[in-house]
Amino acid sequence: MGLEDERKMLTGSGDPKEEEEEELVDPLTTVREHCEQLEKCVKARERLELCDNRVSSRSQTEEDCTEELFDFLHARDHCVAHKLFKNLK
């Protein structure tokens, strides 16, 4: 077994036509991006960004943005849960 054979095993057949396959798109990513544009998610993201800016501007603080992060993720994932399974086969 030579070096060329090993390359073919690692990368496929070595045929450039096979390597130009259509790139698959994860439906979860697409639905998340759509849901992040909805009003409830936009407001939650704004609260998260305000908190992040507030915490980042201070050198000494006990505050973190865990609650705001979870609120944003909950709002986004709630939207995703209702839309994602319609896109799956």
From Swiss-Prot:
Pfam families: UCR_hinge
Record-linked InterPro entries: Cyt_b-c1_6, Ubol_cytC_Rdtase_hinge_dom, Ubol_cytC_Rdtase_hinge_dom_sf
Keyword Protein biosynthesis among record annotations: no
GO molecular function: ubiquinol-cytochrome-c reductase activity
Coiled coil: none
Transit peptide: 1-13
Protein name in UniProt: Cytochrome b-c1 complex subunit 6, mitochondrial
Organism of provenance: Mus musculus (Mouse)
Lineage of source species: Eukaryota, Metazoa, Chordata, Craniata, Vertebrata
Gene it is expressed from: Uqcrh
